[in-house]
Amino acid sequence: VIREETLTIGTVNASLCSPRDVFIRSLQAGASAVLVMHNHPSGDPSPSGEDIRLTRRLSEVGDLLEIPLLDHIIVGDRCYYSMKEAGQLQISKR
């Protein structure tokens, strides 16, 4: 890990994050890969439709920039959901 950053602070049920925000900071840090994490204050780490869409978009942009998205982890109450472990994230083999 070369850098940990808070990109946004959301409300109880929403947060806005764009691939642009993620990858600008990744490029500035000279990152070779990215891991994204956020929490669900409800305690249920199940991904929302927006979480899944964001993961797909981050993966697409990461592939274009050759900075792969390693995982998108959602933290709940004493549990987590890994998009990679759930098979919702395909890591590009470059």
Positions of predicted regions on the chain:
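Hydrophobic "anchor" residues
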Residues: 1-2
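Active-site-proximal loop/helix of nucleotide/amide-processing enzymes and allied scaffolds
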Residues: 8-94
